[in-house]
Amino acid sequence: MAKVKTKAIFKSYNQQQALLLPPTLDELISANHLVRVVNQVVDEMDITPLIEQYQGGGTSSYHPRMLLKVLLYGYSVKVYTGRKIARALCQDINFMWLSGMSRPDFRTINGFRSSRAKEVIEDLFKELLLFLMREQYIRMENYFCDGSTFVADGNKHKMVWKKNALRYKEAAEKRCGQLFKEIDELNRQEDKQYGANDLEEKGEQSAITSEAISQQVKSLNQTIITATGKQQKRKAESLIKKLEKESDKINKYDRQIKTADNRSGFNKTDEDATAMLMKNKVEVLPAYNVLGGCEGQFITGVSVHQNTNDATCFAAHLEQVGVQQPKQVEKIIADSIFGTEQNYELLEKKNIGNLMKYPQYHSEQKKKNKENPFIRENFAYDNQSDTYTCPNNQQLILKSTSKQTHKKTGYESTIKIYQCTNCSNCPFYEQCCKSEKGNNRTISINEKLDRYKQQARQNLGTEEGEKLRKSRGTEIESCFGDVKHNMEFRRFHLRGVKKVKTEITIVAMAHNLRKVHLEKIKRLKNAA
């Protein structure tokens, strides 16, 4: 039987329909929307330090609370640039409701972020943490710490390497040395002609400095004035041009070396950015090392560094987050890269619980290491005689004590060297000694570090310590994962370490607001 075709019916559609009572923007936004969380949290924050950034006078300014809301919400929904936020304020009802229909342009938004917010960003972050504590999202007890690299806003093809600057400077100085010899030869020719020997010879004995080059240029100018022959004048003029060219190069390389400082190099676009190896182990890009800490997957501290090594940045990280946090954390849980003597000592001074692994932590737990009598950790130690005993019952006595200084941090460690009295005819020599045949077994002992390791081993071995150690991967790694994957923030949009620090703190605040939103929805579901 053929299907009967009926007339299609459509819902009413009239763009010109006038409403007697037009809906407000508030009615169009759902009760559990993220924008309402941002609005509520910022309304409860004390932004007095931010308001104090405004000197007063002149025309009226957009309210800083509104600008802060717009900026945080923009970062929460992956709108990071000033122009895109300004466009959203005209097109997106969430932005329009949050701003109260205010429409600051992109210059106002960028200026607020890069100047006024930059000066008080730590205070604003602290206010957000206080809100999280009041609402019992965090307690500031445990601090799960780790680092991650973020690409800088710089051209990857415009890297300046310090070693190249040093090499090029050395070559330029050699060329200057050759020019100095030519100047000495020109002076000797002048002396033969005029019989005056009042010009000091530079040549190889002269240090290539800006003052030395200026002095040579001055003498050449004098030669041009006094010389009667055209050939001498042309030669002097040519040498002046060459010297000035090499002088400019040396000054340029000096500036590059000074800018690089203790780094391997810098980026021309963002001079504070450092070349760092990305996670794929292939690309080397201008980047910053971001160290962060969290509790309950809420970011409770964040800092920016120009060094790729997390361990050497840890002391600076604690100093920076100390300003951001309303109270000091009780325990720090971190991966083995952080387990250095300097960092352990820092935790002890600050009276913070030590749950940081060290590089050999997992290998020590293996059966083959526990049962290996030839590793120095398994040698018996006699405290009274200050000696170690090897598997062949031979004593290792203290041979020397030395100081070792860390190249980058300057931290000094005390190392004790113990040596066996007699390893000749030892049946375990091949298994015990890794050095050349005939040398007695020596071991290096850092008593202070060993004490800190034992402390970490005991803390991590408890039921609570084991639970916290296992939670580290799901805590801070989840925060970085949310920022990089869900928020798609892998590259900074500002330049300079201070502005970059401001931006990553805004990102951390946006992450926390997103997390509050999810927790509120979860609580509503559990209450239903």
Features from the language model and the residues they span:
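A short secondary-structure junction motif
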Residues: 44-49, 92, 96, 486
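Basic, short loop/linker segments at the boundary and entry of helix-turn-helix/winged-helix-like folds
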Residues: 30-72
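A generic alpha-helix surface/boundary motif
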Residues: 19, 67-68, 126
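Conserved catalytic-core motifs characterized by acidic clusters
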Residues: 99
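Hydrophobic alpha-helical membrane-insertion signals
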Residues: 1-36
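Anion-binding and metal-coordination hotspots
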Residues: 2, 6, 12, 71, ...
